[in-house]
Amino acid sequence: MFLGTHSPRLDEKGRIILPAKFREELADGLVLTRGQERCIYVFSQKEFERIHESMREAPLSSKQARDYIRVFLSGASDEVPDKQGRVTIPPALRAYAGLGRELAVIGAGTRAEIWDADAWNEYLNEKEAAFSETDDDNLPGFI
């Protein structure tokens, strides 16, 4: 499970060092793809395969499903971390997420997310007020 917030830097070759806590789960390979809110989703290969299988169940007659699957999969890149735990983020994904040098890598349960540090801080500041007001109606059985 991916948890916490980490602050790696993007190097001049477009690589990041994965947080140590994430490396074991991602050692055999990972998939980077466009995330919602202009971040990059990071999935283990196994989790991405599970998601892909569920996407295959979506009806082809659903325009919304087709659109989502196209955007999600066309931005995907499978990567294998090097021995130092570094992963190259493809230029198109770096541009999509507006990544600068300072990053925030957050754990989101079954995935990690890579954010530009300023964008993450802005998002978090914006959402924290609503977070404190979330009730059982919005997330049944969760709180």
Curated annotation (Swiss-Prot):
Name the Pfam families for this protein. Answer: MraZ
> Per UniProt, what is the name of the gene that codes for the protein in this document?
mraZ
Instruction: Tell me which family the UniProt entry assigns to this protein.
Output: Belongs to the MraZ family.
The record's subunit annotation is: Forms oligomers.
One cellular component (GO) term of this entry: nucleoid
Answer yes or no on keyword Cytoplasm. Answer: yes
**Residue limits of the SpoVT-AbrB domain?**
5-47, 76-119
Where does this polypeptide localize?
Answer: Cytoplasm, Nucleoid
One GO BP annotation is: negative regulation of DNA-templated transcription initiation
Its protein name is Transcriptional regulator MraZ
